[in-house]
Amino acid sequence: MLDQELLAKAEANDVQAIFEVAKAYYIGDGVEENNEKAFELFSKVVALDPNFPDVYSRIGRCYEKGWGTAQDLKKAVDAYTTGANLNSAGCHYYLALAYENGTGVVQDEQKAIQHYKIAADLGDTDSMVEMGHRYRAGNGVEKDDVIATEYYRKAAEKDDSNGVYQLARAYYDGLGVEKDVPRSTQLWEKSAELGHWGAQFYTGINYLTGDGVEKDAKKAAFWFEKAAEQEHPDATYKLGALYLDGVGVERDPTKGIAYIIQAANLGASDAYFLAGVTYFQGNYGYPVDKAKAIE
């Protein structure tokens, strides 16, 4: 339920309060999601204060996606441009995406990079990670692992899960920094705690193998389960294997093969054979289904 004091301020035309209520309707936070109401309130913010920078990324997204209003890519770009001129990091990020993909504008990679860089400088972590990727791959910029890693570090310092994950990879591979496996392990676990499914998988692997940490099968199972909850294919397979073997968890072949089959359905190549055999032979209580086995 929305805070009554906030609603009262919004009714009194407090611009910040109107913006907060609009965001609540936009994402369904404390109130049922309502894109039409959100767009109406975002538009009211613009009418009351045209120099309110943060509103333009939301207005732009509404126009771009047709949320609460008719889709209009030109109006979306216009909104992003207005916000970018007011130093909105989000608007620079969405302008970068627009130029990268040619959405509402003529595709222009260099303009995309320009806006990603400005957004990163203004604190947008998605843009920091994107610039890191570009410098690591030499995509539109000269390849430079040191600069790439610095962008990842900046995102990591803001507790961005992907930034922490990419910084962990840099330390593990020695890209732009001296190789440091224990440091990468610490960072992977931090990223895992922040919810990054890839980091949860690698943290599980680290605890299973003792790579950079003391072996702990229970912790491995814990992190594989966290990643499996996000449908990470390989983590789901690993969790199934642990249940089949009783490693880090109480042995439960039924649960184990269920995870294996789920992993196969998610695309984990290691799971295909065992899932196929299960259906072919009718193992673990599953009926014989040779058609599924062949799939």
List the predicted regions and their residue ranges.
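Hydrophobic face of amphipathic alpha-helices that form TPR/SEL1-like repeat modules
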Residues: 20-27, 41, 58-65, 94-101, ...
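N-terminal segments that cap or nucleate solenoid repeat domains
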Residues: 1-29
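TPR/TPR-like (Sel1-like) alpha-helical repeat modules
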Residues: 288-295
